[in-house]
C-alpha cells in the first residue's frame, strides 16, 4: 500500500463522514518538509461537524493510530503526518531489489489488446520531425500499456493512397529517373512532388491529369498500379531503416490502401441503418445530437468515398481483429474534429465500443517559430537530424570519457534518446520549437542528463563491487535519501497516471525529478565511505538505477551503463 492510501485509510477509520477516495484526493504535500510528509485539511468537515477546522484537526489527530507513522500532529486546521522513514525505505528498497525491472508491473489490462494507430507517414514523402511525435508518443504508450498489463498492438496506418499518387505518377512520367529513385527513393520522390506542386499552381491541367491517373489507379490500371507499388516498396525500405535506428517496431503496416475493398460494407451498414442523408448530391450522416455542427461527409457527389469512410472501415476491422479494450489514435491536434465525427458515426451505427476509442492529440513541431510543410519543401528530415544528434553525442562523450568502450553504440543511444526524450517531456498538447543543441545537452532537463545520472550510479556500483541481497534488510532515514525513496515509491502511480492520461510527459518529468534528486544526494553524501550506512546507501543507488532505467525504457530510451 502506498503512503497516501495508508494515510487516507487511517483517516477514514475516524472520519465516517468522508469516503476514503475523497480523503485521498484532499491530501496535500506541505510546502516545507518540516511540516510533515502529507497533510489533511479539515476545512471540508467544518460544515458537517459544525466545528472550527482547528478544533476538528486537533481532535482527529488524537484519535488516529500513530503506530504506522513517526508522528501525527495538528497544526492549525491541518493534520500533519510524519512517515516512518526507516520502515518505509526498507519496504521500498526490498520491493525494488526483489522485483528488479518488474517493479511497478500492474495487471489492469489483464492481457487485453490496445490498438495504437501511430507514426503513419505518407508514402513517397520524407519522414520528417513532424512524424516523429506520433511515432515516439505511440511507442512510449505501447511500453506503458504493457507495464499496465495490456497487450499493445502497434499499427502503422501508412498514407499509401490518395490523389498525391496521381501527382507523383504525372511527375515521374515527366521528369523521373529510375536509377536516381532507386538510389535515393524519398529524396528523388520529394523533389518530383515539390516540383509538380509548384507547376500545378500555375497550370490547372496538372491537377486534372493527376486526378485522371489516380482514377486509373483506383480502377486497377496495370501501369498506375505498378508505379504505385514501386513507390510504396521503396519508401517502406527507407522508413524501416529509420525505424530500426529509432528502435521502433510495428505489428501491422495495414495502410489506407488495405481498406479499399472494405468501404462498401460501411456504406451498406449506414444505408441499412437509414443513417445516410443526401446533401447537395453527397451522402452525409447528421451528428447534431452529439453537438457536432457539421455532418460527416461519407460519399462525394461524384461517388468518391472519403477519409472518414476509410477510417470507419479501419475501426470495424480493428475491433473484429483485435477485440480491443482501447483503441488510440496518436494523430496531430488538427484532426480533432475528424475523430469526434468518427466516434459519433460509430455511435450512431450502434457500436458502443466507440467509447473505448481515444484521439491522443499533440501539438506542432516548429522551426524558428515557423510551421513545417512538405509541399513547400520546408521540412526537418529525421534521418540527417538523427545522424547529427549522434555526432553531437559522440563529441561530448569523447570530451568526457575518451577511453570509453563501445563509443559508437553509446553515442547512438544518447543521440537517439535525446531526440525522443525532448519530444516526450513536452506536454503532448503543446508543440515545441526544434533545437538540436538543447536536445543533446548533458545539462538541464534532457535525455542525456537522465542517462548520465544512471551511468554515474552504475559506475558507483562497479567501484563498490556491490550487488544487493534480497535477504538483507536495508533502510535509510536521512532527508536526502528520503526524497529519492518517496519518488521510487510513487513510480507505480506515475505509470498509472501516464496511462490514464495518455501522457508520456508525466513519465519524462518523473525521470528528470529522480535524476535531479539523485544528483543532489550524490553531491551531499559520501556514498562509498566505509561505515555502517554504506550498504544502505548502495542499495538506494541500486534501486534508483533500476527505476531510472525502467522509466527511460518506458519512454523508448536506452540507458547505457557507461557514458
UniProtKB/Swiss-Prot annotation:
It comes from Streptococcus pyogenes serotype M1. One of its GO terms (biological process) is arginyl-tRNA aminoacylation. CDD domains: Anticodon_Ia_Arg (cd07956), ArgRS_core (cd00671). Belongs to the class-I aminoacyl-tRNA synthetase family. Keywords: Aminoacyl-tRNA synthetase, ATP-binding, Cytoplasm, Ligase, Nucleotide-binding, Protein biosynthesis. This is Arginine--tRNA ligase. Monomer. SUPFAM superfamilies: Anticodon-binding domain of a subclass of class I aminoacyl-tRNA synthetases, Arginyl-tRNA synthetase (ArgRS), N-terminal 'additional' domain, Nucleotidylyl transferase. The keyword Aminoacyl-tRNA synthetase applies. PANTHER family: ARGININE--TRNA LIGASE, CYTOPLASMIC, ARGINYL-TRNA SYNTHETASE. The keyword Membrane does not apply. Gene3D superfamilies: Arginyl tRNA synthetase N-terminal domain, HUPs, Isoleucyl-tRNA Synthetase, Domain 1. HAMAP family: Arg_tRNA_synth.
Amino acid at each position: 500500500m502506498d503512503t497516501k492510501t495508508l494515510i487516507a485509510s487511517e483517516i477514514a477509520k475516524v472520519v465516517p463522514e468522508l469516503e476514503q477516495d475523497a480523503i485521498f484526493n484532499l491530501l496535500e504535500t506541505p510546502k516545507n518538509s518540516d511540516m510533515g510528509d502529507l497533510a489533511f485539511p479539515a476545512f471540508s468537515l467544518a460544515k458537517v461537524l459544525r466545528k472550527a477546522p482547528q478544533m476538528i484537526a486537533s481532535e482527529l489527530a488524537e484519535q488516529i493510530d500513530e503506530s504506522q507513522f513517526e508522528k501525527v500532529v495538528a497544526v492549525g486546521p491541518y493534520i500533519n503526518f510524519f512517515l516512518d522513514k526507516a520502515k518505509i525505505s526498507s519496504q521500498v528498497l526490498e520491493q525494488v531489489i526483489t522485483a528488479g525491472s518488474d517493479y511497478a508491473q500492474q495487471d489492469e489490462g489483464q492481457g487485453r489488446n490496445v490498438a495504437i494507430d501511430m507514426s503513419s507517414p505518407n508514402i513517397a514523402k520524407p519522414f520528417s520531425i513532424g512524424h516523429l511525435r506520433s511515432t515516439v508518443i505511440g511507442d512510449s504508450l505501447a511500453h506503458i500499456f504493457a507495464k499496465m498489463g495490456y497487450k499493445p498492438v502497434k499499427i502503422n496506418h501508412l498514407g499509401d493512397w490518395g490523389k498525391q499518387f496521381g501527382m507523383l505518377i504525372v511527375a515521374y512520367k515527366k521528369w523521373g529517373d529510375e536509377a536516381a529513385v532507386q538510389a535515393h527513393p524519398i529524396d528523388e520522390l520529394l523533389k518530383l512532388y515539390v516540383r509538380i506542386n509548384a507547376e500545378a499552381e500555375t497550370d490547372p491541367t496538372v491537377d486534372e491529369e493527376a486526378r485522371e491517373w489516380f482514377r486509373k489507379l483506383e480502377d486497377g490500371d496495370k501501369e498506375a498500379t505498378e508505379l504505385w507499388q514501386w513507390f510504396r516498396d521503396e519508401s517502406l525500405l527507407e522508413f524501416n531503416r529509420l525505424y530500426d535506428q529509432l528502435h521502433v517496431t510495428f505489428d501491422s503496416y495495414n495502410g489506407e490502401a488495405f481498406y479499399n475493398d472494405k468501404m462498401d460494407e460501411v456504406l451498406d451498414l449506414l444505408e441499412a441503418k437509414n443513417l445516410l442523408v443526401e446533401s447537395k448530391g453527397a451522402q452525409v450522416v447528421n451528428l447534431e445530437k452529439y453537438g457536432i455542427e457539421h455532418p460527416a461527409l461519407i460519399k462525394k457527389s461524384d461517388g468518391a468515398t472519403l477519409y472518414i469512410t476509410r477510417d470507419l472501415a479501419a475501426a470495424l476491422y480493428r475491433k473484429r481483429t483485435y477485440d480491443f479494450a482501447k483503441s488510440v489514435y496518436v494523430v496531430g491536434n488538427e484532426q480533432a474534429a475528424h475523430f469526434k465525427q468518427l466516434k459519433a458515426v460509430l455511435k450512431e451505427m450502434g457500436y458502443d465500443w466507440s467509447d473505448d476509442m481515444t484521439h491522443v492529440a499533440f501539438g506542432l513541431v516548429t522551426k524558428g517559430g515557423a510551421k513545417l510543410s512538405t509541399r513547400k519543401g520546408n521540412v526537418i528530415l529525421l534521418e540527417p537530424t538523427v545522424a547529427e544528434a549522434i555526432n553531437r553525442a559522440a563529441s561530448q562523450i569523447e570530451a568526457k570519457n575518451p577511453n570509453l568502450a563501445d563509443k559508437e553504440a553509446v553515442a547512438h543511444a544518447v543521440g537517439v534518446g535525446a531526440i525522443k526524450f525532448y519530444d516526450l517531456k513536452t506536454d503532448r498538447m503543446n508543440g515545441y520549437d526544434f533545437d538540436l543543441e538543447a536536445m543533446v545537452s548533458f545539462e538541464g532537463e534532457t535525455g542525456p542528463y537522465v542517462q548520465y545520472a544512471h551511468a554515474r550510479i552504475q559506475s558507483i556500483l562497479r567501484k563498490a563491487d556491490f550487488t544487493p541481497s534480497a535477504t538483507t534488510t536495508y533502510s535509510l532515514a536521512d532527508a536526502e535519501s528520503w526524497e529519492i525513496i518517496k519518488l521510487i515509491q510513487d513510480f507505480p502511480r506515475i505509470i498509472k497516471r501516464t496511462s490514464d492520461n495518455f501522457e508520456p510527459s508525466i513519465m519524462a518529468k518523473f525521470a528528470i525529478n529522480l535524476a535531479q534528486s539523485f544528483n543532489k544526494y550524490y553531491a551531499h553524501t559520501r556514498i562509498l565511505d566505509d561505515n555502517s550506512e554504506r550498504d544502505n546507501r548502495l542499495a538506494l543507488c541500486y534501486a534508483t538505477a533500476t527505476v531510472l532505467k525502467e522509466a527511460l525504457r518506458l519512454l523508448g530510451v536506452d540507458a547505457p551503463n557507461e557514458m
